[in-house]
């Protein structure tokens, strides 16, 4: 049990459905979990299990849900306010799609600073680029001039430039080559330690989730089946039959 004053993210009976009338389908079914401040926590499962839908609700991108979402013990309204996004940022699966093709890197990084009225804008851009392993020269490039790994570094920089306390990570390495995946995972790991960030990671990749996370929730058909430590996953120690099959299939 995580003490109340150490809680960063919490969902209570989170339920989400899409469609109308007879076509309405429940995709998340009374999901509850709690993250400690500074923890890296993973949601893993097959495509369509509801994990990305949960992440979008947490980020305020889907306001049609039942149950409660809390950050730092404060229940959030379905429509988030501007201060919320100073504390909570999201990194998406496809870095090319999440960056405006006609905006240079400097403009992509400057936009949130202006929106929130933050000072030292040029210094902040240089600092955050260096923190993700990119030189100042990259500020004058467009997304199509960057490799996949460089684009994802820019996307991470754009999230970090707000100095948030929480990052929501939606399959942040799945669109990248295997060699680049390791670089981005190591970057995310070092950023969490340096900045004392809380991570909620959504992925279908066991290697990714055990590399980055301490605890992992197994999702299936909209339900949270069980929580395991990364160590338990590495050793295949699961209680639920579905989880045992999922772990075995992932190792095959």
Give the label of every model feature segment.
Residues 163:
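Conserved catalytic motifs of ABC-family nucleotide-binding domains
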